[in-house]
């Protein structure tokens, strides 16, 4: 409703496309006044805009020249995931593209990130889990059934949701049942289905069944959200990219004291994969490969990881965090409080050793 054309047949490639006279001033005024009224009547009310053109200022306060919505939906993210699932081989999942899509937003607007919504759950479309596993969901979801397609689907489902949820700058959205990989679509009674109620439901019992794999996804989602909630103002913490490499298919970023590491490669695991992070000791707090979540348990999460000192990055206050990254897994590590940790002591000792060596070499040169 922001445009006389409803945005149909228009490409929004530059800011000039948002201010070319095609905008419906009455509609914009209506939305602005509506937001102003809503927040005056109820200061705790939240308004969210679902808009595809990317109109600037939509989720900016009226006092700051915006339209007054509290959030806008990050509609590019679910479109990206569906596109990559439909068109790309696992070997062609590029972390640089994933990073761009999940963090592509204006700094002054808060967004609601989501991997999928009701659009994918309704009849006629497919949810992420169904695109990953398809009909094998009906035959191989027993907890003790090690079926390749199901194992792949569970692993990627967790990784997709983790990277989407932990790169938010506003909020995270989930459509009921998708968090545990509900196997069927939703179809409300209508003439086309004979007014049937068969698919007008969510089978909540699936996630509670100990003999089925749905509980693995449900448990992971619960732990993931608990981690996010445990960090004060998580959504406001800067998202800082540590590393991405499309060849390795590895992505890493930081928020506060947390490091998020993803290996999207379907076949390549890495030993001692180095990432430059603030020096210290890191402990794994969430791992998609944890057996509790249907993973293979290929890493020992009880191990604390100490960064290695490198004089080249001393001024940047960074050291090498060396990790084992199994294929198609992701982990979250927390930097422990710096109570003169062993890694710090090692770093200081290494610095003194390097300085002593340099002084010794300099003294030799002076003698010569």
Task: Write out the residue ranges for each language-model feature.
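C-terminal beta-strand-rich structural cap/linker in extracellular carbohydrate-active enzymes
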Residues: 256, 301-340
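Polybasic, low-complexity intrinsically disordered segments
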Residues: 341-346
